[in-house]
Amino acid sequence: MRQFLALAAAASIAVADSCHTFTLANSPPDDKAVALSSYSYCGGYLSASAFVKNLSYDKLVTLYWTNADNKSTPLNAGSLDYVKAASDDQSWELWSLNVTTVPDGVDALLNITYVAASIGKTNSQQLNVQVEATGDPIPTPQIPTIYKPYASPSDFSDDITNWLKPSNDSQTGIAKSFLFNNINIPGAAPGTVIAAQSYSEPDYAYTWVRDASLVMDVVNRLYSSAKSEEKRQLYEKILFQYAKAGAQEQNDPTAISGMGEPKFYLNNTAFTGSWGRPQNDGPATRAITLIEFANAYLANGGSQDTVREQLYDSDKYPQVAPIKKDLQFVASNWSSPSFDLWEEEESAHFYTRLVQRKALLLGADFANDMGDHELSDKLKTQASKLSDTLPEFWDSARQLILYEYGPVLRGKYSYKDISVVLGVMHGYANDNVFSYTNDQILATAYQVSTSFLDVYKVANTTSDESGKPLGIPVGRYPEDVYDGVGTSQGNPWYLTTMAMAEFLYRSVQEFEDAGSIIISDTSLPFWKYFASSVDHKAGAKYNKNDQSFKTSLKSLTGWGDAFMRRAKYHTPSSGHMSEEFNRTTGEPRGAKDLTWSYASLLSAAFAREELRNQKNYLTNVADL
């Protein structure tokens, strides 16, 4: 962490010569373990240094301030980075930060806090220092950046239809085969999903709670649609094995973070090395998948007693039935900070909140069906409380849903992360709360996806060999430094690029179901980029029979296919999909045969063919 933050600080804009540094202390204090030494506020950048007593190796030093409106929010804080020793005996260290404060601004420094994690001590210094700006003027934020689209695709394309056809030799068939190759691999505990059969550089030979649930969601959709009795029984067996494996994980005494433990060995015992834990999205996504499986199982004529004994009732059947315990955990822990789905930072995350909300809402109905009315009421109450926190993530100044509601972490100054889009895909509860057509979601999808245009050189290749448009290569977030093996420069990911395709397909479906489109100031940049063939104006409304309605949705569909074509363009003819493709060359990078990549392709294909009204598509894939 220190090394990364140092790199981030070095990459920040240096304090200009015209900036003035205000000194508060020239030497370490005698009566405190932390003290602010100096600060400078210039050109929208806040720089500060502090003396920190060397009480432990694991340290977290945070400076808090109020914004330009003299309000303190979770955004108005910054983590300091180790610079050097500040005393000959190494008992004191000098730490610093250099962060942009645009668009929020700074009014006053409130306090600096030092957590010596390994010894459990917290130290702080109250400041209440009125900040004086010097040097260059604070820039006026231009948010969001308006990009001119490089293409105007429209409607479905035959090449993508052929690539995704329901046959064993298509990419859909290949993806399905490779996905199942990573479930119950030889020697692994039944019900486990290996993230990738990559055992070094990188070592992904583990089962992750979240990833496994997303893969099993695809398996459940196949189960729900299969006509082949042989295939249906196979999927059913795997899903019951998965449920039992989840219960075993819940009860593993070696799990350091208990129910929030994210990662297990293939024998289904907890990984106990250093890791980003807890990850509280996992119990939520597992509950969602298993509730949806339980409902599908009952719809197929399954026994409610079997559902209660092998899926739901964790109190009576703790070794095999995980749903109730997952729901109880989500209800009691949703407000606690946890690590994000990228396993990098601890905060309050939009993705985690949205999947937790869906779990609570689905769980409330399911618990009621199981006769567990007291738990059902509790889940409804907690879902309502969680829902009240979601508006906090919308930043009107940035015109963006923040991926996390907290200070800048790991140098992610843009606050842009594709996890917001993934949150809608995995956590939308079909109740118009942050739906696919929500203006704030559309604005965020536009900002996040276009943010990679200036990051990846491969984005300069905008068409394939036949001249068909390629969608934007999408990574996790623009400041990413994980390169698939180590840290250098981040790359586009297959699953995030295809997630944008699925997002657009599902947006079109939702607009068609609604029968109208209303353009707002917030959503206007989205429409101007992804439906540029219509001269959109804020305040315009298109009804289902209007040509602008039809043209706009055909444009979104065309961009959906363009994003799929981007993934296709960087996929070798063998159909093998890695985690990433190189930001410069476009060659596959990182873990080979990433299970989540195949799940993402299948999920996008299901959304596309549903939009095309291909009612037998999912059944045909399930029966392959």
UniProtKB/Swiss-Prot annotation:
It holds the Pfam family Glyco_hydro_15. Belongs to the glycosyl hydrolase 15 family. It is an enzyme of class 3 (hydrolase). This is Glucoamylase. The active site is at D340 (proton acceptor), E343 (proton donor). Keywords: Carbohydrate metabolism, Glycoprotein, Glycosidase, Hydrolase, Polysaccharide degradation, Signal. It comes from Blastobotrys adeninivorans (Yeast). InterPro entries: 6-hairpin_glycosidase_sf, 6hp_glycosidase-like_sf, CBM21_dom, CBM21_dom_sf, GH15-like, Glucoamylase, Glucoamylase_active_site. Glycans are attached at N54, N70, N98, N111, N168, N267, N333, N460, N582. One of its GO terms (biological process) is polysaccharide catabolic process. GO terms for molecular function: glucan 1,4-alpha-glucosidase activity. Residues 1-18 form the signal peptide. It catalyses: Hydrolysis of terminal (1->4)-linked alpha-D-glucose residues successively from non-reducing ends of the chains with release of beta-D-glucose. The keyword Cytoplasm does not apply. Its EC number is 3.2.1.3. The gene is GAA. SUPFAM superfamilies: Six-hairpin glycosidases (SSF48208). GO terms for cellular component: fungal-type vacuole. Residues 26-132 form the CBM21 domain.
